[in-house]
Amino acid sequence: MAASDAHNNNKKRSNRRRKKRRTEDFSSSSESSSSSSSESDHEDLDEPEKEISKQDINIDDIDIESDNENSALTNDKGNKLIPQNLSITEKQQLSTVPFTTTSISNITNDNQIKNTPNINEISKNLDQKKTQLNNEFLKIMTTEFGDDLDELRKKPDFTEKSLVILAKTLQSGVNMFDIDVLNGLIQESGNTSNQ
């Protein structure tokens, strides 16, 4: 019984491969639509298996560096790659050479940011501004969706917890805008409500 199942599975597999080959190669007229299994058909079926196994090669497994490249470089304690053929004094001189900096790297230098004397005050002001913008955005959203919120309050399963969840959900929408866009939205809604 197991032998006949294996034979049927092989037959199904060969039919699938034959159909797949037909769709891939439109110009091939040597294959027929009959389901006869001959040795030539069996030999043709082995070729796609070889192709698939070649396609299954993982790119990460391929070594792209040659032995010559690996031996020419060494990994120093400071994670600096230094050629091996340099003398000790040349290596020391190389390690003392500072990295080049651009105006952007000078602006974004972490050490300068950390050494800013009033960094705590600046971050506190930013947090206050963010909280203020969040509250203003929540006011806009409750105004926009006021009718919908009233309808929800009338539902029997609406609780105080539901109100908190809705408010937090509406307020979290502020995160999809950057500060300039958010300021524009708040100013625009302030102008329309005053008119």
UniProtKB/Swiss-Prot annotation:
It is found in: Nucleus, Nucleolus. The keyword Nucleus applies. One of its GO terms (biological process) is ribosomal large subunit assembly. Residues 1-61 are annotated as: Disordered. Residues 9-21 have a biased composition (Basic residues). Keywords: Nucleus, Ribonucleoprotein, Ribosome biogenesis. Associates with nucleolar pre-ribosomal particles. This is Ribosome assembly protein 3.
